[in-house]
Swiss-Prot record:
Extent of Basic and acidic residues compositional bias: 111-120
Residue numbers spanned by region Disordered: 100-124
Enzyme class: transferase
Substrates-to-products reaction catalysed: DNA(n) + a 2'-deoxyribonucleoside 5'-triphosphate = DNA(n+1) + diphosphate
Primary residence: mitochondrion
Name assigned to this protein: DNA polymerase I B, mitochondrial
Region (Polymerase): 699-1032
Amino acid sequence: MAVAPPLPPAPARLLRRWQGSSPWLSSSFGRTRYFSRPAFAAGGRQDYSPSSGMGVSKTGAFRLGLHGNLNVQSSVQEWVDETKRLFFLRTTNNVRNNITNGTTPLRVGNLRHDPSEDIRSSNYPSLYNQRERGPSNSIVNRHVDTDLAKHRVMYQSAHAVPAPFSVANNDIKPLNLLDGSKEEIPWHDSVTVESSLPKVSKSETTLVVDKAIPNKKEHKRITRKVTLNIPDKASLSTESKNARKLLATIYDKVLVVDNVESARSVVKLLTTKYKGFIHACDTEVANIDVKEETPVGHGEVICFSIYSGNSDGEADFGNGKTCIWVDVLDGGRDVLMEFAPFFEDPSIKKVWHNYSFDSHVIENCGIKVAGFHADTMHLARLWDSSRRADGGYSLEGLTNDHRIMNAVLKDIHKTGKVSMKTIFGRKNVRKNGSEGKTISIEPVKKLQREDRELWICYSSLDSMSTLKLYESLKNKLEAKEWIFDGCPRGTMYDFYEEYWRPFGALLVKMETEGMFVDRAYLSEIEKTAVVERKLAADKFRKWASKHCPDAKYMNVNSDNQIRQLFFGGIKNRNKPGETWPQSKAFKVPNDESIATEGKKIPKSRTIKLFTIVEDLKLFTTEGKKTTKTGWLKVRGDVLWSLAGKIPTDHIYKIDDDGQEFDEDGSSVELPEQDIEDTSPYGTAYEAFGGGKKGREACHAIAALCEVFSIDKLISGFIVPLQGDHISCKEGRIHCSLNINTETGRLSARTPSLQNQPALEKDRYKIRQAFVAAPGNTLIVADYGQLELRILAHLTNCKSMLEAFKAGGDFHSRTAMNMYQHVRDAVEEKKVLLEWHPQPGQDKPPVPLLKDAFGAERRKAKMLNFSIAYGKTAVGLSQDWNVEVREARDTLKLWHRDRKEISAWQKKQKALAFEKCEVYTLLGRSRQFPNMTHAGPGQKSHVERAAINAPVQGSAADVAMCAMLEIERNARLKELGWRLLLQVHDEVILEGPTESAEEAKAIVVECMSKPFYGTNILKVDLAVDAKYAKSWYAAK
């Protein structure tokens, strides 16, 4: 039995749509269908047929048959789409390409361009369900597992073609399959004719040719392996079909602009007749990863839409066209530039959903966007700052939420935004033909070119939905009272116009400015970080291998392997009956190239790790975080609790034998101490027996913690800051600044500059990489204890107001008021609250309070900040590692002289439960869910948030007002200074070096009096400012 090699790859499909209308095309497709058959490709090879199975008659004519149960809709477009999909079922076509009727080459017909001919003539393919064929015909049958799916495709003959290619090779020769030949191909159940097949995947199947032998009553069966092309895209879901049908209803409302002449006509209307309207704008952009890349300098606008309206209704651009859709793909740059007068006119009011993104991508094309009127994302956050469900703040989520849209005008289109995933997404198909879970979407350029009408509707709906959303949110905010620091001030839409509208424009301006980054410096500290990480990892492995030999080869980034070393035998929190094993085997990379003699070196090897701690009771897991699967998390606090508070420099000074390195790298034996101070060490000290072994364990585990810390700095800051995806050609990074926190604080992403490591943890001085351009300087200005000052103002706390008025070390004063023995020491002048050295003085005459009573001051400091965050005695006990009773007693000491704060906290909790919202200084609100049926955990969370939100939110209000004050300052503009970044309570500006001193004084003045040149708070706003070439030096 001969087995032929796989079939050659099939040529790309071609499809020619029928132009014009024909009576016979409008008839029902229940019995007969018609389609155009493209001409053959050059070189004599015939093109693919829209077939799922073939039959060849004695006359050489093909006929297409459909399964009796196939759902056939009487729609031309439906049939055309189905025909397209059938083109991709290529296996049977490969068979058909190689079938001849006896020794006669295959004949295939082309559809004539004259549809007036009788449809029964041989020039038109007919489509019908072939149940049976005579024995004289050569049939191609496709099996669906055991059932024969009678999907047959046959064509009428019109023009002869060259002999087809052989199955075995590309030679032009007939296969000479005679009458009665039969070919069978197994097929998968889930692969339907209706599948959409823009791509195909391959799987191997068996082709069986049952060949009749002339003049004999026997057949010769030939079996060969062939490649079966299986679709990798499933059919549209019912949801997608319904959404498409609804979406198509807006097409008649859209005016398509795709040339310069029509663009000029539209722009003339926009800038004259409809200039006073509100214009909602939206862009569609290709060549950008919105999750990773900044839109500044990235992305390509392929189309945009504009939808205009006012209180009287929609703009009309002729023939009922109310929305403009502009095609700028494939050479449409000139069309886009015609809209520059519209976009750049500051008097034309424009509304956006995510103004930042759209404005940047338009400005990439050389158009400076002006006339910002509203960002519906900001309006939605002002209305409800705590949306987490129902799509959050996406355009789809907002416009399909009746609670948001119930204030919209009735005459505006009612269709809410529909996601691209719903309209264009299709599930992939697995290799076995079954439907997968992953949904993929074609590139937007392809969608715009090939699904043009649907794409026009989809992208136009964005601007239509944006205007509708703006109208509804504006109505809602106008109905909500604005309370400014306890006094009525107007409506919340008035607040938006006065503060958040200019603030939104300022944030976009700051994003455009960006900040210069020294990549050469980042590259150098990356090398240092990699070396130090290796040293720390090797230190830990060396120590661990003393207790477990295979730990020498372990992956220090594997939580499971670390858990195995320290926590074998712990119980699963989700499944109490399940425990982590005492020993376990792991696969690790074979970096040492270990191999069995005579065999190849494997890429991986197996190691065995076992638990190295005997007394697990010393490792308390109570109150520790667990993974989703119920196992103890082994990062962060858990490992540091084992190591203790060991300075990081000790990790590189103490080796595994308890020795300290000299300057030259040699080591000397540490002297034994009569009384060892064990306070810096964690629970691992006792667990490993104390003394030398205990110290070794703590230092080794601290080294492991350093591995994680260094990894975080490398992956989170050092490497990303060097990427092109967040920077432009000038070397400046452009992060995205967003008002998207529940309290109103800014967040920054791509990159997340808000999460820069604290100075004491910034071991590689990452801020040193943020520098001013040549000839410029950075000013870094920071509020001092802003949230505590806000708390003092909101609560009118006499003790705190007096402490801030007196000045000095606030936390030392708090400790003095909390602890009588500290107060006695201050009054007896044994310690000083603070000390300001005079010329010639090197040290204070007596110790400072922060040095003599460090523990008390640390507790006071933590309490000062914890109270503002609503932390309870339970939380404090965990922070201090003490009993809850002790933490509660300390908390009472703090509240003893601050009764106003206790009363204010009760009031905030009551507001959260009664009105389901609390308010900031400027009157913004944070909403909470109804607590009537909430559990204890949820109630506790809301109580803490009710205390924290007004404080943090008011601090955000102050920072915003300060930035607006700086932006409005004419002198700073004249000197050439501009805002670059805001990180929490800190702002950064850049400008000419020669005017740095004057500019710094102006910035301090603006920040200390941020409310139009005044300070409405009961306490002064302390501002510390410096200028230098880098962010680090100016801190």
